A protein has these predicted regions:
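Short aromatic/hydrophobic "clamp" motif used to bind/position activated sugar donors
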Residues: 83
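Conserved donor NDP-sugar-binding/catalytic core segment of glycosyltransferases
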Residues: 95-125
Length: 234
């Protein structure tokens, strides 16, 4: 896998989460010495947590920044045909998720793969909200791909062709880039990544639903993306 895949993890002040992600990566089958770039801009103890939890993982910490900048910094270093972006707060429910999605990308000659979301902190409301999002995204993906940036596997050449993540926008970089891909070359397989309820706790369930709907309705409105206040989400 190390000759095919590069993993990029954007990170900022994730001392309570990054250790769990690294544990999940250590348990992934076939990962071997796959290069993992953690693009970090933390001011907390994140780097110490990384050092304590790296194990056998082939990790290199590089300069981070805003989400798009951090992801692009890592992708720029990739020399493999595929690059996988994973958020620092992600967990997995299967030890074969990376191996399986990489196989699907190659076998079906796809350009982009995203995953469904599942809540791991036992919040019933978040579980329902994620479930509704999964259904909606699956339906809309027939016309407009959206690989949630928490797990976004792409061909490196296509990523570069589309210009990478848009640095000029403060958030929703995953949505803006995803919709440039062909729906025929996109897949959401039967795998999940896990996240907790923290963004719902910050924005509220109605607030999050409104945020996603407004972004969708303004998907081609340049001025909308430029004026988004990322602090409301992050």
């Amino acid at each position: 896998m190390e000759n095919k895949l590069t993993i990029v993890v954007p990170c900022k002040d994730e001392e309570n989460y990054i250790g769990h992600l690294l544990a999940a990566l250590r348990s992934q089958e076939g990962l071997g010495s796959t290069k993992i770039y953690i693009a970090d801009a933390s001011t907390d103890s994140t780097r110490q947590v990384i050092a304590l939890n790296s194990g056998h993982l082939n990790i290199e910490i590089i300069e981070g920044g805003l989400v798009s900048v951090a992801k692009n910094n890592g992708a720029r270093l990739a020399t493999t045909p595929y690059v996988l972006f994973i958020d620092a707060d992600v967990r997995f429910f299967s030890s074969t998720v990376i191996k399986d999605t990489l196989h699907l990308l190659e076998e079906r000659n796809l350009d982009l793969i995203g995953l469904k979301i599942k809540c791991y902190d036992n919040s019933i409301r978040s579980t329902i909200a994620f479930g509704l999002f999964n259904i909606t995204n699956k339906v809309l993906s027939r016309w407009m791909p959206f690989a949630v940036g928490a797990y976004m596997l792409t061909r490196t050449d296509k990523f570069n062709e589309y210009g990478g993540f848009p640095n000029k926008y403060p958030t929703s970089e995953d949505f803006i880039l995803s919709k440039m891909y062909s729906p025929k070359k996109f897949l959401i397989p039967d795998h999940y990544f896990g996240q907790d309820s923290r963004r719902f706790n910050k924005m509220g369930y109605f607030g999050m639903a409104k945020y996603l709907l407004v972004n969708f309705l303004n998907r081609n409105n340049e001025s909308h993306w430029k004026k988004i206040d990322a602090k409301k989400y992050w």
